Every structure is written in C-alpha cells, then in structure tokens.
Regions:
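Bacterial N-terminal signal peptides that target proteins for export
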Residues: 2-10
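Active-site catalytic motif of lipid deacylating hydrolases and related acyltransferases
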Residues: 23-82, 118-121, 128
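Short hydrophobic segments within beta-strands
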Residues: 28-31, 85, 113, 163
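Short, solvent-exposed loop/turn segments at secondary-structure junctions
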Residues: 33-35, 91, 116-118, 167-170
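C-terminal catalytic-base region of ester-bond hydrolases, centering on the histidine
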Residues: 153-245
C-alpha cells in the first residue's frame, strides 16, 4: 500500500510548486452527511495548514458541491497545493465537484475514509436517521442517486485513496440491507470505489473501479464501524498521533 507522506513530497516536486512563504500547502477536511464541517478534530502536518471546510450537507448535493468548489478556489489555486481528506458523504461531494467543474485546482490527492461516493443502500431509509440524525439530504444519498448523478470517472487525473471498515454499528440490523462487507452505513462497494453495487469482501477485490480510485493502507479494517473510520485515514497519513482508532 502507498506511503502517502513520501507521496506528498513527490507530488510537490511534480507540481513544481515552491513551498515558500509565497505558497501554501493546505489540508482540506470535509465531513459527512448532515454535517456543516468536519468537526473539532483535524489532522495537522508540519508546515501545512489544516482547513475545516464549511460544507453544508444538510439540504442538497448542489449546495454542498458549490461550497466545495468555493473552498478549492480559495485554497487550491495559484502557487498553493492541497490534500483533501473526506469522510463518508464528503467523498461523494468531492467526486461530484471534480466531475462538474473544469477548474485547474492543485490537488495532490484525495484521501477518503468510509466514502459514500457510490451511495448507500440506507439512503432514504429510517436507518440513516437513527445513525446520523435527520436532514433533507439523507433521503437523497442512495446508490441510484449518487451513481447516476455524475461521472465518477472524471477525476481530473487526481488519485482518490480509499479505506473501509467492516465493523458493527448500532442499531446493527441495517447491515442486512447493505451488500457484502460494510461498516454499518456504507458497503465496501461504495467505500472502495467500485463501479457496481455488488457485495465485496474487501476493497482490494479485483473488480472494476472508478478511474484513479485505489485501496490504501489496508484491504479493510474489520473491527471499525462507520463512525470509527472518520479519523482513520488522517491517522494513517500521519496527521494525528493520539485518539486514533
């Protein structure tokens, strides 16, 4: 699996961006469904600035996508370089933003934990409300909503590294609705970037994935549920050393 800290150095060289006072490296954090930001805990890397992106995922993907694009316009152009850390439905917001915009953002990679990019079979069910609390957008994040909503292969050539969990999440019974292995909210078909909703036993399974989507660090985290996974990618990438699952 990829060692992303070394990968960051290689990307900076590839972009030929001087990491001086005239340029910045920004680590953009994007939360999940029904959230308005990532939350209180962000990753921190020496010499880089962490951003708690103000993305409102309560009402519509259109609103969230517009706010995501505005965030990238602010931090990821000119001499700046960004790394984008997304959780849950934040993965779908980022994917949709790339697909619907032709802007030349300087993004080294997207790091996705428990991504709902491919939608959840729980979308529009009472289970979403039990797990995350109710919001209007929760009724529109199903597999057909997300998979048919935009071109997931249009990534501007940007890599999305993905990790997934397979742990139990209260109220537990919803896992019967999700195909294959799942973290209690999304299946590994979604969290692994696969092009179909067929059940998967890990995100390393050999099957078609959306362009530039990769499994990073582990084929799955068998004991971690959807909530546990939120900080796992940031921890794996060196942004947190305490409070890691």
């Amino acid at each position: 699996m990829i060692t992303t800290r070394l990968h960051k150095l290689a990307i900076a060289i590839l972009f030929t961006i001087p990491l001086t006072a005239h340029a910045g490296v920004f680590d953009i954090h994007v939360g999940g469904i029904c959230s308005t930001n990532f939350g209180d805990t962000l990753g921190h890397w020496a010499g880089e600035t962490s951003i708690n992106a103000p993305i409102d995922q309560r009402d519509s993907m259109a609103t969230a996508t517009a706010q995501m694009a505005a965030t990238l316009d602010t931090y990821c152009t000119g001499g700046n370089l960004c790394y984008v850390y997304v959780y849950s439905n934040g993965g779908a917001v980022m994917s949709r933003t790339l697909a619907l915009n032709a802007r030349a953002w300087n993004i080294g990679y997207v790091a996705a934990a428990a991504s709902n990019e491919g939608g959840s079979e729980l979308g529009g069910t009472g289970f979403i409300g039990e797990v995350f609390g109710g919001c209007a957008l929760a009724g529109h994040i199903g597999t057909s909503d997300h998979r048919n909503g935009w071109n997931h292969n249009d990534t501007h050539g940007i890599i999305t590294g993905m990790i997934a969990g397979n742990g139990w999440l209260a109220p537990f019974v919803q896992s019967a609705v999700l195909p294959g292995h799942d973290d209690g909210a999304v299946s590994e078909a979604s969290a692994g970037g696969y092009t179909t909703t067929s059940g998967r036993s890990s995100i390393c399974e050999a099957a078609p994935k959306y362009a530039n989507h990769q499994a990073w660090f582990s084929c799955e985290y068998g004991s971690l549920n959807h909530l546990d996974m939120k900080l796992k990618m940031i921890c794996n990438d060196g942004g947190l050393t305490t409070g890691c699952p």
